[in-house]
Amino acid sequence: EGTLHEAHLQEYQQQGKHRRLVTVFQGVVMGYQFARPFSSTTLVRQDMGLLNGLINFGSRLTGLKLEPVKMVHPDFERRFEVVSTDQVEARYLLHPAFCERLMEMEAAFNGQNMRLAFAQGRVVVVIETKDMFESGGIEADGDDARFATTIDQLGSLIDLTQALNERAR
């Protein structure tokens, strides 16, 4: 059981007497019950190099003791930062085949900001994108390419959904 939403979050920002609407997030948000039982909290985000330490410090302020996890998949380790309350369970959730699917999904979305949260038996996947289901406008030029990209992206979402429903072997 899961949900898939295309979301556009905006907020007003004040600069002197001027108030303007700014996009905070635009993209896809998916939430699913994970097929494998788990009790830890695990977060996955694109690797930010030296900034990872600052972000990890900020995560300690939430009361969770999230520690960096070394992953067995070398390409995944290079591209993503994983933090968790349980190192062993994080590797159990993010097994190599699942990591492959995540990297395929990242490629389908052109490496745009993708994040995952595993908590309370569920996984939430957030990917920043432009409007997935909107055409380019009145002019049809480029619509075929946009349609093909959308099909690839939806295919990667379906593949990930299937991976989420796979039980441990």
PLM region spans:
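Charged, low-complexity intrinsically disordered regions
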Residues: 1-169
